[in-house]
């Protein structure tokens, strides 16, 4: 803080100096007072200290110093002198009182606010004279209050990111289910019951986990999918129902409970009871491992498992013979008592037909020439079983809306076979025959014949030339009996009030699309697993059964621009544009909006030191333009390393073009700045480790501190506001960047209590050692030297100036004059182009104050080493020095005339008024006044006398980026907005060279001349007396 009100005395002697004249000057900077200023002045709307404000403030000031070519040396406080330690003790007692005062003020403020609120309620509740009597209406007990919305922070560790969901969902398909679309599997089907228990357990476990994770969709995606909150609630309830079904099915499969979901086909799974004398072991066979639970466990030929179906072998032989002869299969012969999965395909599907492997491909058959055999269709009594697959969940088609929602739909496997114009996916209803099982084998023969008829419908002239699948038109007789249609409901069609129409699929319809397969492919699917093993199949039994009921997952067709796995196509996809028009993005409801997290109050933005909208606007506009009319394709055949290398090459080429004008001009000040986006991992790791260690340490306050008066602390706040406004202009004009948002100053002040509470909070905060370490880390990355003084930083700055290691001192602490400082620069960051310069020679010449007089003023006004005399202001103190010459004469005058009325009567008007003021303030001047210890502390401070010159390094751009990102969360682009233009301008100025000025050839006093002081009459009279004493 320095000497109280000393700047008011020395202020008239200051001269404005242009910042350009300080180019290439070595300046000692008192860093400790900077930290104190940021701690006291930078506050949020509630008066609390803004976290890391000292880092942002130092970063801003360092950039300005380097821009004007100033070479700074930062000096930090070290130990604490004995006299100052005593002052600190008294200050801490006062700080503790401030803390208690802050609590008391907060209670008063709360009581006042509650009183105001209570008065408003009473006032509003008073009925008017003309108002009618209000009728009481009971509120429904189930009526819930309206919730306008909720807020959350995207950086909250409790909120899972999209990458976390993607990793977790990918792990679900990691246990041999990579090529299986789990969403299409219906655990309630008969085919699922035929799978091995181990496979059923694996599938049910994956489905349970996937249903619990809301199928992997992010918040933004769900907002777009469900614009209505009621639809989202239905989706949640539907997921709970399916998860309960999966859980019950899993319990029944493992044998922990009988009955339940396993009774769909009237089979009960019995739990195996454990016995002490019985063991279960795995036996290795030629085809793998089997679990022996009985005598005929299938481990060898003698212990073969007996199959009840004696006709199965004959049936398979007949199937093989039909496949070899190329017989035609008829579709209506495939009806049996087992479950049929009806796959809904779009009429405009672009699925490529499979190549035929039999001789029917060579012969060929036009669709117009082929006629189908008339087959009698027998209606059957069927019952409908609900589809419990995830694909049939209550989830509408997302299409392009998911991509526009903000994150890629990496889990949408249900619509992978996408067509240019997709229709709404449907819920499949399986049908199960109610006839006896004895007719199964007879129906299988009819199924084979029906499959042969299917082959005729697959024959086309050019199956691979056209984009759309051609449909064979069968010829049927009018008398053919119609098959009962299979009803397919939409996802929301199960609701009675749904507006979506029902889709009815008739197997005799001419518009029904048929997927082409060969007879051998179909036979291979319907052949029992034992026969496939005889053919030398490599797949395990579980995989064979999974392939029996599911197809492989096709390639994903993402349109997410942010993904590294996609690149732009040269041709625009017209069909995707049509899809976007047909599927508009629904409006997000306010209660499900993600913008709330971005509108949360951030205390880091209250200071608003550095902000630019150019880069952000360019990114947003670029994102909008790339979203329009651009399509992407999946990069296959590349691993992650190759993809990252591609992206890195693109980024590096762009950065090189961007920063080509940054060149090395001199190794003394700057060198080439690496602007590639390749921050070393070690730097960021070190930053994270340092931050963690800092957070773990207890942030203890330092012993040293500054003691400002109330008026001086108010001036600090005003000066910081002026500095912020000046920096806005400096950043906008000098660095040629866009205007940033103005600083949010103190919000409304409700009353005097609120203002007093803010002052109390300001007084209670103290500088910590962690703050100093963070600032020193920032200086090292800028390449700026710094030292820690043995004791006082101001004394060390004055010593550096006397040793000619620096050319001036930048500080707002007036103690520097008392330690021997002669060239002081103050208010460096308040004006754009000027700074206040104070010279000890000018002060002596204009005010008549030398170093000894300044120390005597400190004992009257108060400083870090003494509390001063109560009631003594700057004018009275300088009048005392001018009237009595020194403090010893002043003490003799006061003590000798204290009880001598004769002397008091002979005193002049000034002496009478001064004595009256001292007596009213109960001033006692003892033998220790003036203090010799205070005089020695200022005249002979403990400093470092080392004469080693300082060396300035080169700012490390990558290290600065990582530091600002770690400490303040700044992205690299925001740091580059300040650093890159700064380095460019510095290099440009260095290239032009330094111009000689007239003050380098002539003494300064010949240029400036005598300056007329603008002081009060009393100070002018007192300084006149002082100057006469010096003559």
Curated annotation (Swiss-Prot):
Hydrolase among keywords = yes
Give me the ranges of the annotated region Disordered.
342-367, 406-426, 459-480, 570-591, 670-694
A single GO cellular-component term on record: nucleotide-excision repair factor 3 complex
Residue ranges of region I-domain? Answer: 756-884
> Which family, according to the similarity comment?
Belongs to the XPG/RAD2 endonuclease family. XPG subfamily.
Supply the NCBIfam families for this chain: rad2 (TIGR00600)
Q: Protein name, please?
A: DNA repair protein RAD2
What is the native source organism of this protein?
Answer: Saccharomyces cerevisiae (strain ATCC 204508 / S288c)
